[in-house]
Amino acid sequence: MFVGSRKWVVLVATIWIQAFTGTNFDFSSYSSELKSVLQITQLQLNYLSVASDMGKVFGWCCGVSLLYFPLWVVLFMATFLGLLGYGFQCLLIKQLISLPYFLVFLLCLVAGCSICWFNTICYVLCIKHFPSNRSLALSLSISFNGVSAALYTLIANAITSSDDTLYLLLNAIVPLLISAVVLVPILQQPQPQPNSADMIRRDSLVFLCLNILALVTGLYLLFLYSLSSNTTIARVILVGAGFLLVLLLFLPVIVNSREWSCLTSPACYPLLNSRFNLINLDGGGGDDDDYDDDLHKELIENEDNYSRNRSSVIVREKCCFDTVLLKDQLKVLGEEHSTKMLMHRWDFWIYYMAYLCGGTMGLVYSNNLGQISQSLGHNSQTKTLVTLYSTCSFFGRLLAAAPDFLNRKIHFARTGWFAAAVVPMTIAFILLAITGSIEALRMSTALIGLSSGFVFAAAVSITSELFGPNSVAVNHNILITNIPIGSCLYGLLAALVYDSNADGASRDTMWLREMTMCMGRKCYLETFLWWCCISIVGLVSSFVLYYRTRHAYYDNFGRNTN
C-alpha cells in the first residue's frame, strides 16, 4: 500500500458518514404521516421542521467538544443524539407511544443537532488530513450528504415499499451502524505529514478519479431510482450502490499503484500541476513550525503588496458608493479569526445574509416539498421529488470542486462562484410561480437542489479561506445559525399562506388548532413569489461579498502563480 494511503481511508470514512447521515433530506417522506398522527396544522408541522434545523444552533458545541474529547467519543455522542431523536419519533408515528407536541419538538431539535455534529466531525477530519487540498476533500465529502435521501429510499424500498414510517427507524439505526464501521480508521488516524510537490500532484489525480466515481454514483442513483419501487429491483440497485461506495476505498490504491505510476507524470496530465488549494499550496516539506512562520510572513508581505497594488485602484474608486461598499474589506485570505473578530467583520455579515437568503431557502423548500407536491395533486410523486432534490443537491455539491480543478486556467474568486450558484434558485421560484405542472415542479426541484447543494459545499471552503482553516469548526457553525432562523421565517410564511388558503379555513384562530388541508396552486403561489424575492436579496448579497473579496482572491492567485 502506497505512502499516505491511510489518509484516504479517513477521507472515505467521512464520505460514508456523510452519505448515511443526511437524514434531514427525507423529512418530506414522512411529514404527512407525522402531521396526521399528531393531528396538527401545517403551521405546527413547519415548527417541527424548524426544530430540526434549530439543531444547527448548537453545532458549535461539537467544535468545543472536540477540544476536550477524542473524536471517536464525539462521533458516538452524535450517534446517540440521532438515535434518541429519531427513535422516539418512530415509536410515536407507529402509535406505540403517545407524546405531547412539545416533546416531539424537542426530539426534532435533538435529531437535527446530531446531523450538524456529524458534519463538523467530517470537516475537521478533511481539513486535518488534507491541508494542501482541503477544498477538494471538503467538497467531495460534503457532496455525498446529498445522496442520503436516495440511499434511504432504496433501503426502505428494499425492505418494503409501502411503509413511509420506516424512514424514521432507518434514520435512528443506520448512522449508528456506519459509525461502528468507520470507528477503526478514525481510531488509527495517521499523523498529518508535509506534502511534497510530487505528492500534491499524485493526490490531485486521486481526487480527480474520486470525483469521476462520485459522478458515476450520482448518475447511477438518479437514473435507476425510478425502477426501485419493486422490492427485488430495489435490492439489486442497493447492492450496486453499495459496491460503488466500497470502490471508493480501493480507488486511491489502484490509482497510485506502480502500474498506474505513469499517470502521475506532469507530461501525461498537465492538470495535475494545478495548484488546487487557494491557501499556501506551495508550502512544501518543512516542519509545521516552519510552515506557520512562512504563512505568517506571506500574510504580512501579501498585505503590504495589497496596499501598494490597490493604490492605483483606489484612485479610480473615490466615489461614495465604493467607499461604503469596500469598508473594512478583507485584505488577505487565510487569516485566523476568533469569534470576537468574526462578529466585527462586515464580510461575515454579508456572507451570513447571502447564505440566509440563498442556501437556506433551498433547505426550506425541501422541508416543504411533501406538502407542495400534495397540494399540486402530485402526492404519488413525493418520493421521486425528494430523491430528485437530494441527488441534484449531490451534483451541486460535487460541482463545488470545479473552481479547484479550473483555477489554473480560470482565476475566479470562489465567492463569485457562490454568487453564480444562487441564480438557478431564483429562476426556479419564478418557474414555480408561473405554472404548477409536474414538469415544472421537477425542473424547479432539480435547479434548487443544484443551487443549494453548491452553496452548502462551497460555504465550508469559503469560511476556511476568509476566516482561517483552524477556526472553521466553530466559525462555520456560527455561520449556519442562519439556517434555523431562515427555516422559521420562510417556513412560517409558507405555513400561514397554506393554512389561510385551506378549504373551509375560517378567519378566526380556529385554523391554528385544527388540521387543515389545502389543494391547488393557491396554496403556495404567494409563497413562491415571496421566496423568489428573498432569493434575489441573497443573490445581491452574494455579489456584494464577491465584490469585496475579489482582490484578496486575485492577489492570492498571483502569489501562488509566482
Language-model features: locations:
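Intracellular juxtamembrane helix-capping segments at the cytosolic ends
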Residues: 27-30, 34, 115-142, 152-153, ...
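Hydrophobic core of transmembrane alpha-helices in multi-pass small-molecule transporters
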Residues: 85, 98-117, 440-454
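Long, low-complexity inter-transmembrane loops of multi-pass membrane transporters
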Residues: 186-344, 350, 552-562
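Extracytoplasmic gate region of multi-pass secondary transporters
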Residues: 24-34, 220-233, 332-334, 338-395, ...
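Central cavity-lining transmembrane alpha-helices of secondary-active solute carriers
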Residues: 47-67, 84-85, 91, 150, ...
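Glycine-rich segments within core transmembrane alpha-helices of 12-TM secondary carriers
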Residues: 55-56, 130-184, 198-224, 392-395, ...
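Structural signature of the two symmetry-related core transmembrane helices
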Residues: 73-88, 414-430
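Interfacial helix-cap and linker-helix signal at transmembrane-aqueous boundaries
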Residues: 34-35, 65-67, 155-161, 224-227, ...
